[in-house]
Amino acid sequence: MKQLPDFLKEYKTALQKYRLCSARILAEPLKGGETTDIKSSKFLGTPYLPAGADYPKDKDGKPLILWAQLNFSEIPHLDDYPENGIVQFFVSADKWYDCEEIKVLFHAHTDSPPQTDFPFLTEDLYEECPIWCEHRLQFKEAEEYGGTEDFRCSCMFNGKSPWELYDTLEPAQKEVFDDLFYGTGHKIGGYSYFTQTDPRDYGQEYKNDVSLLQIDSDDKIMFGDTGTAHFFINKDDLKNRNFNKVWMYWDCC
């Protein structure tokens, strides 16, 4: 457990049981003409696909778009998550808001020669994509102690709710509190942030699902009215590297 700020130290024992590690993502929009390495972590861009592998398509045969590629050899290790290999998130080009047409691929090994020619990924395919350009990704390990909308978080501060405590804090303290408890931003794991409500709270079958990836609205990313997109996976499926049942959800203000 990392050192808590002074104004939270009196709650250390109570907060310990809520501690989760996450990998924060710094997403840097690429400038015109820049590209990422085919195996690198990225938002948008060219995916790593072994030669001969089928490119993911929707039920009508239309190519899905690579929203994100995570190379776990570049990412701080998180319990239960892969230590190596590439996880990819492909989403419908024009019906992404329905959250139905998605495909998540896991490449445990990446030493096979990659495909390099994707002529069907034309510019018009990206017209409705909420991620507006390719991003280079960097990662930083973080600790979180709650998410104000995450159904798993019910922490109290000597009888005060997170919101009641927040109202008593100084501006600088509020910034620190936000980092530890609000769950915003791009990240892997940890607590999830919602502008509306946590969909896992509405069905027992989702209670064991964790965040595989959260993509937040940013300078070059916009989900509706500053919303957030999520990809959830059953914790046992994650441990077993079974990504066939990953599901997507997004909401906005």
Segments and roles (model prediction):
Residues 1-253:
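Preference for intrinsically disordered or flexible, low-complexity segments
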